[in-house]
Every structure is written in structure tokens, then in C-alpha cells.
Amino acid sequence: MSALRDPRNADILNYVGYSYRRLRELVPAFAHFRQALTLNPRHRAAHQHMGEAYLTIGNLAAAEEHLAALERICLIPCDEYDDLQRVIAKYKSSAMH
């Protein structure tokens, strides 16, 4: 249980941020994603989840920045890139209707 209280664990910070995002508590979600990315700028899941959070508030440009970061990080295809790319495409498609 001590891992849950470790502010230096990027995985835990990402999971907490993800949980806040699912609860639509975006201020603490963004704070946790930022902390995770400060500790590990190459944290793929944090980039994916932060990109999805940006779409929740309608910030497509910021979401695409995280997609670009994933493209640089993932030397071979990775699920996080594919998932965020899919969510962005769906967002763009729904915005056109």
C-alpha cells in the first residue's frame, strides 16, 4: 500500500489521474498526469490519458501534441499511440456533424 502514497511513482500518478478523469474531476486529473510526465517524460500511458483528457475539454491541439509525443516515443507501433489516434479521429468525426 505504500506505493499508492509514493509521489515519485509515475505509474501510480498516471493511474490516479486516469481515475480522476473517469470521474470528470479534470483539475486533479491534469495535475497527476503532469506529475507523472515530469517524473517520466516518456510515460506512454500518461501521454495517452492526458491527450484524452484534453479532448474532454475540447482542446484538440493539446491532444494532438500528446499524440506527436507518442509518435516520437513509440519506435514501433504501440497501443497508447493507436488508442489516442483512434479517439482523436472519433472526436474530429463527431465535431464535423
Please annotate each region the language model reported.
Residues Y15, H49, D83-V87:
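Canonical tetratricopeptide repeat
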Residues R5, L39, R72-I76:
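Structural marker of alpha-solenoid helical repeat scaffolds
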Residues R22, T56, I73, V87-S94:
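Register position in tetratricopeptide repeats
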